[in-house]
């Protein structure tokens, strides 16, 4: 018989986390994968590690020539979803994949989903002219809770990491766009969920969420509650 309690990845009813548990001093403090390394079009990409999976964000406006090295032995390799028909070529510990357009897929070895690699390919998003909040490449921003107001446009540049949650209440015309990362791990204990929503907009009108990666949030990741005209486009939500 399956042991549901002991098989849980996250403990569903932890004590509330009332303040961010830690402050990141640089993007280098985020844990990196030891199992995978990835290059795209000859450029090495950062592969991050979470307690559930590894992931890499790949941004380009051209075709994607991917080299994925797997540094642990395996017998069976699967690329999912299988409906994409991605057939890699394999040479040693490196697999080669060519994509003519962005795809989001997983690399799984020996049926292991919990140590799979999520490959998240996207087109590059340029900085909007009306940007009011800009998070720049190569930097980490400890926002705690980023509270938006009407007409805010948040741009998260590729390579930027925003540590915290996002909240908007009764706002009009707000957007979060870019190719960077919002990481919510500071708002929950390891192996636990938490009571706080990750990206929470309530009673808002005209909301755009596009391109960025929302990972390791404390609870429900994207919650537009009682909002009108919400567009969620090409996000990576994990």
Q: Where do the model's predicted regions map?
A:
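Extracellular/periplasmic carbohydrate-active domains that bind, remodel
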Residues: 1-238
């Amino acid at each position: 018989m399956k042991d549901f309690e002991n098989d849980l990845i996250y403990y569903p009813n932890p004590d509330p986390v009332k303040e961010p548990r830690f402050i990141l001093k640089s993007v280098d403090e985020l844990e990196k994968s030891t199992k995978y390394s990835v290059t795209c079009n000859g450029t090495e990409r950062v592969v991050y590690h979470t307690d559930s999976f590894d992931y890499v964000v790949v941004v380009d406006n051209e075709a994607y020539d991917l080299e994925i090295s797997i540094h642990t032995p395996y017998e069976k390799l699967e690329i999912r979803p299988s409906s994409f028909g991605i057939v890699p070529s394999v040479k040693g510990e490196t697999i080669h994949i060519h994509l003519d357009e962005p795809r989001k897929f997983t690399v799984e070895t020996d049926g292991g989903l919990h140590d799979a690699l999520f490959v998240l390919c996207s087109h590059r998003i340029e900085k909007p002219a009306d940007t009011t909040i800009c998070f720049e490449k190569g930097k980490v921003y400890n926002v705690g809770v980023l509270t938006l107001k009407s007409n805010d446009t948040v741009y998260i540049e590729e390579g930027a990491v925003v540590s915290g949650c996002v909240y908007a209440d009764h706002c009009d015309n707000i957007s979060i766009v870019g190719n960077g990362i919002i990481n919510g791990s500071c708002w929950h204990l390891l192996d636990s969920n938490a009571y706080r929503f990750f990206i929470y907009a309530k009673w808002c009108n005209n909301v755009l969420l596009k391109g960025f990666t929302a990972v390791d949030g404390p609870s429900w990741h994207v919650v537009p509650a009682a909002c009108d005209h919400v567009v969620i486009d090409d996000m990576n939500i994990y």
